[in-house]
A protein has these predicted regions:
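PLP-dependent aspartate aminotransferase-fold enzymes
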Residues: 91-172
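Active-site and channel-lining beta-strand-loop segments
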Residues: 25-46
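Structural signal for hydrophobic packing residues in well-ordered secondary-structure cores
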Residues: 10, 14, 18, 71-78, ...
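Glycine-rich phosphate-binding segment of PLP-dependent enzymes
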Residues: 44, 50-80, 90-107, 168-169
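Residue-level structural signal for beta-strand termini and adjacent loop
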Residues: 49-50, 147
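PLP-dependent aminotransferase class I/II
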Residues: 83-87
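Active-site-adjacent loop/helix segments that line or gate small-molecule/cofactor pockets in enzymes
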Residues: 1-32
Length: 172
């Protein structure tokens, strides 16, 4: 299958929750380190810094080994059960965190983390109004897309009225 066929099937079968930057996005078949490869074997340098993979590199061997080791022991289990990897990671984070940050709450995605942060802030302050940065990206849920000010990253106009967008700081 070539890139054009993949793009066509993507458009046909996937819900358009987020608009793409390009008319013809790269149909990625492989990724290693900071490089992407399309269906035709063309190589591209991945400059997209908004996703965690680029900070450690695609198909990072050390990360892959750790994942395989964990999968061989325990793939997924409800957060209702305590597990050694989770409590060890929480303890490590608490020991690294400044001040009185002594509790962890793990989520499966950035969107879920943003939703949880909003919920915690509203519970703590009693306020329902939110301030989000104009150039921030928060995810694909309704609240997360409302926090996101880029129209191309939203499927719908902002639905949550209590959100105000502030200019992102310019440090240069």
């Amino acid at each position: 299958m070539n890139s054009e066929a993949v793009r066509k099937k993507h458009q046909e079968y996937l819900f358009p929750a987020v608009k793409n930057y390009y008319k013809k996005p790269i149909a990625v078949s492989k990724a290693k380190g900071a490089r992407l490869e399309d269906m035709e074997g063309n190589s591209y340098l991945d400059f997209f810094g908004g996703i965690l993979t680029i900070s450690v590199g695609h198909a990072n061997e050390e990360v892959n080994r750790a994942i395989i080791t964990q999968i061989n022991n325990l793939t997924h289990i409800s957060s209702l059960y305590p597990t050694l990897p989770v409590v060890e990671f929480a303890e490590m984070l608490v020991n690294l965190a400044p001040g009185k940050l002594e509790k962890c709450f793990f989520t499966a995605s950035g969107t879920e983390a943003d939703e949880t942060a909003v919920m915690m802030a509203q519970l703590y302050t009693g306020n329902s109004e939110l301030i989000a940065l104009r150039h921030g990206y928060s995810g694909r849920s309704l609240l997360a897309q409302s926090l996101t000010a880029h129209a191309s990253w939203r499927a719908l106009p902002t639905q949550v009225s209590a959100i105000k967008h502030a200019l992102s700081p310019y440090c240069y």
